[in-house]
Amino acid sequence: MARYLGPKLKLSRREGTDLFLKSGVRAIDSKCKLETPPGRHGARKTRLSEYGVQLREKQKVRRIYGVLEKQFRNYYKDAARQKGNTGENLLTLLETRLDNVVYRMGFGATRAESRQLVSHKSILVNGSVVNIPSFKVSASDVISIREKSKKQARISASLEVASQREKPTWVEVDNTKMEGAFKRLPERSDLSAEINEQLIVELCSK
């Protein structure tokens, strides 16, 4: 399945919440009505079935992290094989994707932009170029911007935007050096309360 290239705000309206697909320079609610689904008949309220609610939650999380359906299924299988809570394991796996860590550190304004930085070989992991967005980052790994990429205006702009929002506690970033450390795996309490991972587990375990 191809990656979605259409309007980002349309996806946020579809899920009824900010999926953080835009840079955050301007509040998303000033751009569109999140409570109204996209389309000609978006204002019509439809009651979702139990399956529909579960599916929407899965789609929401998949779109937040920018992964394709097959990738998401593989992440779920890995999460189910691990000890502990499957839903929390799933979120942890998604959070350790390199493109997501680059975003969390503020080097990219969005996860999509962060994925592009990785793909274009602008990112180093422990001093070596890694151009695989799904690369799994481990605790204590050091993520940095490649020297020849440090002059990119979009990276400086992203760091400026990131400085205005609350920094994740599981990463530590030196904006001057354009370098950050992935200190630890995030705990469930660190992540968005708007995600109900149990709905995803109920859907995928059927």
From Swiss-Prot:
**What InterPro entries is this protein classified in?**
Ribosomal_uS4, Ribosomal_uS4_bac-type, Ribosomal_uS4_CS, Ribosomal_uS4_N, S4_RNA-bd, S4_RNA-bd_sf
* Highest taxon listed in the record's lineage: Bacteria
Q: Which GO terms describe its molecular function?
A: rRNA binding; structural constituent of ribosome
* SMART domains (alphabetical): Ribosomal_S4, S4
Any one GO cellular component localisation term in the record: small ribosomal subunit
Q: State the Gene Ontology BP annotations.
A: ribosomal small subunit biogenesis; translation
Q: Which residues form the S4 RNA-binding domain?
A: 96-159
Sorted alphabetically, the keyword list is:
Ribonucleoprotein, Ribosomal protein, RNA-binding, rRNA-binding
Q: What does this protein do?
A: One of the primary rRNA binding proteins, it binds directly to 16S rRNA where it nucleates assembly of the body of the 30S subunit.
Subunit structure of this chain's protein? Part of the 30S ribosomal subunit. Contacts protein S5. The interaction surface between S4 and S5 is involved in control of translational fidelity.
Instruction: State the family named in the UniProt similarity comment for this chain.
Output: Belongs to the universal ribosomal protein uS4 family.
Q: What is this protein called?
A: Small ribosomal subunit protein uS4
